[in-house]
């Protein structure tokens, strides 16, 4: 009988942890993997994760027509910090996005954050439904 009473306490113990993990994961999965604009832009390859859970992250691509890569990073932080999501920059470069011709060219490096793995960026873009039919070239 004592064992059954002990087992009845398990849902009360597990429930707060379950809510914490599930809401954090929902926030993480809700972040779009790709946001790039039309034309020639700077871009960042970013690993995002919930605070304290660096092992369970995902990689996103963010690009914009700005003066430097730091401006992109600032916009990423403004987007993610209210959700409790942390960001680690993996590198940066440039993207030439031509949606009319269905072509994307990935090249260059970021002076601030170093070079990104352009092949990984290409794979993320190809997995995204918007850019699935695009011809994506990588120049190291």
Curated annotation (Swiss-Prot):
Recorded GO CC terms: cytosol
Known role: JanA and janB regulate somatic sex differentiation.
GO biological process, one term: cell differentiation
Domain of life: Eukaryota
Coiled coil ranges: none
Name of protein: Sex-regulated protein janus-B
Single GO term (MF): protein histidine phosphatase activity
Xref: PANTHER family: BCDNA.GH02250-RELATED, JANUS-A/JANUS-B
Binding site for substrate: 42, 110-112
Family, as annotated: Belongs to the janus family.
Active site (catalytic residues): 69 (proton acceptor)
InterPro entries assigned: Janus (IPR007702), Janus_sf (IPR038596)
Record key words, sorted: Differentiation, Sexual differentiation
Keyword Disulfide bond attributed: no
Outcome reported for the amino acid change (mutating residue 72 to V): In strain: kenya_2
Gene3D superfamilies, per database record: Janus/Ocnus
Transmembrane helix listed as a keyword: no
């Amino acid at each position: 009988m004592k064992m059954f009473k002990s087992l009845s306490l398990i849902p009360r113990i597990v429930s707060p942890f379950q809510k914490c993990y599930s809401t954090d994961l929902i926030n993480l999965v809700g972040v779009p993997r790709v946001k790039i604009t039309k034309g020639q832009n700077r871009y960042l390859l970013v690993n995002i994760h919930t605070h304290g859970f660096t092992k369970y992250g995902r990689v996103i691509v963010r690009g914009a027509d700005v003066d430097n890569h730091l401006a992109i990073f600032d916009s990423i932080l403004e987007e993610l910090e209210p959700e409790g999501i942390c960001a680690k920059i993996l590198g940066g470069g440039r993207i030439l996005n031509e949606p009319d011709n269905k072509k994307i060219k990935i090249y260059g490096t970021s002076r601030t954050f170093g070079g990104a793995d352009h092949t990984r960026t290409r794979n993320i873009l190809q997995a995204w439904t918007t850019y699935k039919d695009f011809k994506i070239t990588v120049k190291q």
